[in-house]
Each structure stands twice: as C-alpha cells, then as structure tokens.
Regions:
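Predominantly soluble domains enriched in secretory-pathway, periplasmic, or organellar proteins
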Residues: 1-248
C-alpha cells in the first residue's frame, strides 16, 4: 500500500485479527494476528496513516472477567502493528475517538474513566472520571465542548466538560443502553435502548430525554446509531434482527 493509495482496515473480534482489505473487491489482502482477546473497535487517522485498536478483554460489556489494558497502533501504509500502548492502571478499553485537540479519548470501562492519549508520545496523559464502570461507548460533540459516554447497564449518559476534563453529571434514561450518537448540529444525543427496539432522543441543552422513537419492524434491540454528515438521515443497526433502520 503506497502513501497515496486507498485501503480498508477491519477488526475481526471473533478471530482476534486485524484485516486489510481491497476497497473495491473486499478481498482480504493482509492479516495481522497474535493479539490477546479481544481486539475491539477501531480509530483511523488518515492524516497520519495510523490506526488504533484497543484490546478489551475476553468478555462483553458488564461481564468482562479478564480485562485487558492495551491499545495497539498500526501503520496503514506498511500494514504493520508498530506499537502497543500500555494503558495501566486503566483497564477494559473500548470506544475511542479523536478529539478536536488532536488527543485520543478512550473509555476504560472497568476503571470508570475516559483515558486521554497523546499521539506523539503514545502515552496516557490524563484520565477523566466517567462516573460509571459501565461506560462503554463515547461520542464527542461537534464543537468539542462536551464528551458523552453511554453507561450500558446503568441506563445513564455521562456528560463531560472536555476542555476542563470534568464530569458534569449523568442523564437518566428509561432503560439500559447499547449505543450512542450525536447529531451534526450537536443539539441531540441519541441513546440506543438495550432492552427494546427504541431510541431515546436527549436534548443536549437541558440534558433530558425529550422523545422516544420505536424502530418499526425491528423485532429486537439495536446497537449502533450514526448520523449522515448532512444531518438528513440517522442509520441504526440491530445485529440480532439483521436490520438497518434509516430515519429521516
């Protein structure tokens, strides 16, 4: 893969591998394995040619008896695993996002923190209290002022002041959660219901659930929600229903 070419990287959680695919044919062109269980989630930074994959542990959210503490760094051009960041004392790393300040923010579920990583040194430079040992996924507001974690079994969303690195509070939802998204205008956080095929729409101005949307013709709960960049559609996937819902 040359510096100016295109490529695709994928995480195989079941096989504990990282795959490099042909973006036209989707054929697997390179495989990197040998990781502890389990490779989880993915952050790609095209500008630097780097990708980051956390090692969560051998369980699932809320039931992870052997949590791990590593974040693996990949060179996209060389298709190589080039470094492993040790996050200890923080454990069970999961969702990670690139902040507006160029730092990486990653939930460390069992430690109830969002760890902050400097990409130049590949070191943990701070840890922010998330208020929950069930903080699984996170999102960052488009203006960079707030970070939100969805705290699965707790049925709450933590609100963090990102510049101050301070937990402001938690928003209660009617039931446990399985995913989170934020609208491109930053006015709405979507929390995905883990018990029913429903979405909770949270007003970021007052921190309250203002509406519930039932996913029609989806028999089981959903997990992942993503807005289109132009705010025109919200896509919601339900793994156990084999469905993708598109919401205007």
């Amino acid at each position: 893969m040359t510096k100016n070419s295109h490529g695709m990287i994928a995480v195989d959680k079941i096989g504990t591998k990282v795959l490099f695919l042909n973006p036209q044919t989707y054929a697997t062109e390179a495989v990197i394995d040998g990781f502890p269980r389990t490779v989880h989630e993915l952050l790609v930074v095209p500008e630097t040619g780097r990708a980051y994959v956390p090692i969560f542990g051998d369980g699932i959210h809320g039931r992870n008896p052997n949590p791990q503490h590593h974040l693996c760094v990949f060179d996209l051009h060389k298709r190589a695993h080039i470094e492993t960041i040790d996050l200890r004392p923080y454990i069970a790393p999961h969702t990670l996002k690139l902040g507006p300040d160029g730092l990486i923010y990653i939930t460390c579920e069992n430690s109830a923190v969002v760890a902050v990583i400097d990409r130049d040194s590949n070191k943990v430079v701070a840890a922010i209290d998330s208020g929950s040992t069930n903080g699984h996924r996170l999102i960052i507001a488009p203006d960079g002022r707030h970070l939100y974690t969805e705290n699965e079994e707790d049925g709450t969303v933590s609100v963090i002041d990102l510049p101050k690195r301070k937990l402001l509070g938690k928003i209660k939802t009617p039931r446990p959660l399985a995913g989170i998204a934020i609208a491109p205008d930053g006015r709405t956080v979507v929390a995905v219901d883990d018990a029913q095929p429903t979405l909770f729409l949270i007003d970021t101005a007052d921190g309250r659930v203002r509406e519930e949307i039932v996913l029609k013709d989806v028999p089981k709960p959903a997990q992942i929600a993503r807005y289109a960049p132009d705010n025109s559609l919200l896509a919601v996937t339900s793994l156990n229903s084999d469905t993708v819902s598109l919401i205007d």
